[in-house]
Amino acid sequence: TAGPEQTYIYWVMTADSSIVDARAVSEKETISETLTVYDGKAFKGGGTLLTDTLVVKAHGQSTAAVKDTDYTVDYADGLLAITLKGSLAAAESIDIIITRTLEGCVKIVPLLEGGGIPDAAMLAKVLDVVNAKDIRPLTDKVSAVPPEAETYDIEIVYYTTPESEAEVIANVEGTGGAIDRYNEWQVAALGRDINPDQLRKRILSPSWGENLTGAFRVDVVKPTYKALDDTQVAKFSGHLTVSHKVESEVV
């Protein structure tokens, strides 16, 4: 069994002061196999099978069978039992695809300050720390990889009154303004979903100083919301399209 994830993360964070976030995840593999059917049941052993990834097909067919209609699943004590019915009731064999966790195989994913992606030298430094004899269990195999970057563009139109136009432009587009602060927030952690509402909030309600005036309306075309995995990080692509309109606010 792999060592506790939080223990690995703790030591990764001590490897270098530029590391601001990290994940330690058990590695996985997807397997395909043909199973023989015995009295309407097929079996697959293994204590780390992820049953929610299971795909069942009639042998040699490309179309997936339907769970609860063509088969049911029971998984206990390291044995996966697939009971066939419906279109699979008479099958003599079935094809399955399933993902399993690899015991003792741990993948370390560090993130650097400002959303920086670690290079080979930094990854080697992390491995030197976590492979110490008093940290890594003897049965664990540890690797270190960079996070996967998911890029986003920014395209917005915001609205301001004539009286506050100059101030709002500075608060939205200026150095340290809403766009800069959104990008800083977005890239600061692994697995942080790309969330346009966070950009909208900073444009409409700037809160990093006293008595700051924000836009009274904003249309955010990009980015759109996107959920990220724990080992992904959002990265601003550099593609920025910003315009503003001056109107009298209707109260």
Language model segments and positions:
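Extended beta-strand solenoid/passenger and fiber regions
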Residues: 1, 5, 9, 29-99
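Carbohydrate-recognition loop of C-type lectin domains
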Residues: 2-29, 97-192
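An aromatic-glycine-centered, glycine-rich loop/turn in mixed alpha/beta architecture
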Residues: 165, 169-251
